[in-house]
Swiss-Prot record:
SUPFAM superfamilies: Adenine nucleotide alpha hydrolases-like (SSF52402)
Assigned EC number: 2.7.7.4
Domain of life: Bacteria
Known partners and oligomeric status: Heterodimer composed of CysD, the smaller subunit, and CysN.
Gene Ontology MF terms: ATP binding; sulfate adenylyltransferase (ATP) activity
Catalytic activity: sulfate + ATP + H(+) = adenosine 5'-phosphosulfate + diphosphate
Protein name: Sulfate adenylyltransferase subunit 2
Class of enzymatic activity (EC top level): transferase
Protein family: Belongs to the PAPS reductase family. CysD subfamily.
Amino acid sequence: MAAKELSHLQQLEAESIQIIREVAAEFDNPVMMYSIGKDSSVMLHLARKAFYPGKIPFPLLHVDTDWKFKEMIAFRDEQAKEFGFELLVHKNPEGLEMGISPFEHGSAKHTDIMKTQGLKQALNKYGFDAAFGGARRDEEKSRAKERVYSFRDKHHTWDPKNQRPELWRTYNGAVNKGESIRVFPLSNWTELDIWQYIYQENIQLVPLYFAQKRPVVERDGMMIMVDDDRMPLAEGEQPKEELVRFRTLGCYPLTGAMHSEADTLEKIIEEMLLTRSSERQGRLIDSDQSASMELKKRQGYF
């Protein structure tokens, strides 16, 4: 009897699970980055599948900037409790002491101190030699040219001109002490693949991905949700209740909402089939300077 041909999503799933298992077997101290978004939720689901019925054999790490949506933090804690994985949370103590804020210090400085430097602090603190990330090649041009196994030197920096060849899904994970590999098991997935897989597997998500009335203000052509009382309002500026959802999630002052009526997975998938814009257009950190994402990745950002 001929072997059953795998569907497109089954092929992607099998590839990702193979990568996750290979890293767990090859490296001494791996970690999975957990940003609480849809890609992280899919990656967590794949890791649970990869080692079922056992537990995930490595911790999950959330680098908390102290400016995430409240619903994201609540969802993170609920997931850790429900699935019983080890959750590490790191906040840059120097950044907290300095009172770093995206409003007062700008997106570039906030991202560098609270995310990039915070991430490097956590990786050094725990001595991780491999870190899973949920980035996909279709998201952004600098990520499109990055390998599945992305080598980082002892300073956690990335050199796009010095990447290792990956032939026939053969990955080179050799590192010296202090060096590490960033691993992207979702590299070959698209945003639509992610949503179709979430629907197929019934994966839980932060409610922010679904349309509902939310208080927003318009700034620089983007709708920013007023998530807490730390957000300064200009004179005469009043939040308006708009029917919106988020395609991508990050720090709430730096993440734009979109008008949408998609309040179910089916409606979101239908919306994705019609859209012609990138999900990253809703992230201010991708446009705060020229070649923004590649520069951040060279400095140690995921």
